[in-house]
Regions:
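Positively charged, small/polar-rich N-terminal and surface patches that mediate targeting and assembly
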Residues: 1-106
């Protein structure tokens, strides 16, 4: 199967946690790039009640060959009991960017 670019998204309760996890993923060559958003407000149902809270979204640019490993790594380190971990296939990535991703991820 051909290697495909993907984005993995997760949310964290603090910016510091999201930056730390993103930095480690890049340092460990599991992601080419990590981006942490500004504060977002999440609204969700938990334990029968509607709740809301501030979170920070971590976006990891990686390859399909790292998907299983990166999901397991994120799940193991995540502070939430039920972690939001989403995988989004990227239908287009600029050729030069994709080549760079393939160079730095292993």
């Amino acid at each position: 199967m051909e290697v495909q670019p993907i984005q993995i998204i997760s949310t964290y309760p603090t910016r510091e946690e999201a930056v730390l996890v993103g930095g480690e993923a890049v340092q460990l060559h599991m992601a080419a790039c990590a981006q942490v958003t500004s504060e977002i407000t999440s609204i969700y149902r938990w334990e029968g009640k509607i709740r809301s809270g501030r979170e920070f979204q971590l976006k990891l640019k990686t390859l399909s060959t790292m998907e299983t490993q990166l999901i397991a790594w994120l799940t193991e380190r995540h502070p939430y009991k039920v972690a939001e971990i989403l995988v989004i296939p990227l239908s287009y990535v600029a050729p030069d960017y994709l080549s760079w991703m393939k160079e730095v991820i292993h």
